[in-house]
Amino acid sequence: MAKAKFERNKPHVNIGTIGHVDHGKTTLTAAITTVLAQTGQAQAMNYASIDAAPEEKERGITINTAHVEYETENRHYAHVDCPGHADYVKNMITGAAQMDGAILVVSAADGPMPQTREHILLSKQVGVPYIVVFMNKCDMVDDEELLELVEMEIRDLLSQYEFPGDDTPVIKGSAKEALDNPTGEWAKKIGELMEAVDSYIPTPERATDKPFLMPVEDVFTITGRGTVATGRVERGIVKVGDQVEIIGLAEETKNTTVTGVEMFRKLLDQAQAGDNIGALLRGVDRNDIERGQCLAKPGSVKPYTKFKAEVYVLSKEEGGRHTPFFANYRPQFYFRTTDVTGIIQLPEGVEMIMPGDNTEFTVELIAPVAMEQGTRFAIREGGRTVGAGVVASIDA
């Protein structure tokens, strides 16, 4: 059967299901597609097809992720669901599945569990900005007071991690009942959930609306014209005549003007997020700029050397280290287009980090790099990836 092509005329939002093992994340994902399929806004997916998530590689790390898509009246959604807890950790840290918001699934019969807490913490650390709660398995709980108690617990937990627990939408339902009877009473709860997601999770700012940033991949000189920096525009728009800063690696930030933009050997007036370009820079010497620096809109991003990171360390089976590492470990941190050596300080009370762990630690780089909360990086040792991380906060 041919897949119906989604019309991309609605705003696009990336979301995913998070929560403790067996609380019903995959069943809910199946229920959303099945209920929305009744109105032709999705292709119904059953539990087994979502659970058999294909393997993907992101920054050298193997992750199992299922992707489904569906529509509501107002939006087009791409939704990720992971089979195992480790897949969530890797997914969120590598940014393989960037989420504009998440649906936290909590079983009403069990209440919040260890991974519920861990996924909320991860969401905070990696910058998932909004969470909507689906209290699942409510068909198994007869006691209204118990449901209220679980809801209060969830709200408290969200507040502990600086999410607005009191204002977060909490929908009570049963994914299994909705999946088994997509036109029945429980199916209405799926409709309520999607209305909450529609209204509570804002449409993300498009990459082209953000301030200009381009990591420099290569630099060369055109005789008589000047220095050209090439790379892929990460976000924003750059026009001929724009002022930009050259940021990172050097002690000070330099200012210059883009006097030409070239793509596929054609001269353009402007380039935008996703374009691979050469930017001709006025008054910049070949030695003033190098791979690993960034061109950016003045004042939009700053270089730092010290930051706290949320990190996943590859297991031996994934090609990572075979042995743990300790404080003062000095690997390379690969930001965008280059490696910078950094020194690791472990949190208090932690003596070592084992392969396969996810953890938080502080890093001090030997040279500054343009970064902000949410910037991703890989950790490498002799060219081999041994971990992946995300900047959780900056120690200026």
Swiss-Prot record:
A Pfam short name: GTP_EFTU
Keyword Oxidoreductase: no
Subcellular location: Cytoplasm
Binding sites annotated in the UniProt record for Mg(2+): T26
Binding site for GTP: 19-26, 81-85, 136-139
InterPro entries linked: EF-Tu_GTP-bd, EF-Tu_GTPase, EFTu-like_2, EFTU_2, G_TR_CS, P-loop_NTPase, Small_GTP-bd, T_Tr_GTP-bd_dom
Region G3, annotated ranges: 81-84
GO cellular component: cytosol
Residue ranges of domain tr-type G in the record: 10-205
Enzyme Commission numbers on file: 3.6.5.3
Region of interest (G1), ranges: 19-26
Region (G2): 60-64
Annotated segments matching region G5: 174-176
G4, as annotated region: 136-139
Catalysed reaction equations from the record: GTP + H2O = GDP + phosphate + H(+)
Keyword terms: Cytoplasm, Elongation factor, GTP-binding, Hydrolase, Magnesium, Metal-binding, Nucleotide-binding, Protein biosynthesis
Root EC class: hydrolase
One Gene Ontology MF term: translation elongation factor activity
Highest taxon above the source species: Bacteria
NCBIfam families to which the protein is assigned, alphabetical: EF-Tu (TIGR00485), PRK00049.1 (NF000766), PRK12735.1 (NF009372), PRK12736.1 (NF009373), small_GTP (TIGR00231)
Protein family: Belongs to the TRAFAC class translation factor GTPase superfamily. Classic translation factor GTPase family. EF-Tu/EF-1A subfamily.
Described function: GTP hydrolase that promotes the GTP-dependent binding of aminoacyl-tRNA to the A-site of ribosomes during protein biosynthesis.
Subunit structure: Monomer.
Protein name stated in the entry: Elongation factor Tu
The organism of origin for this protein: Brevibacillus brevis (strain 47 / JCM 6285 / NBRC 100599)
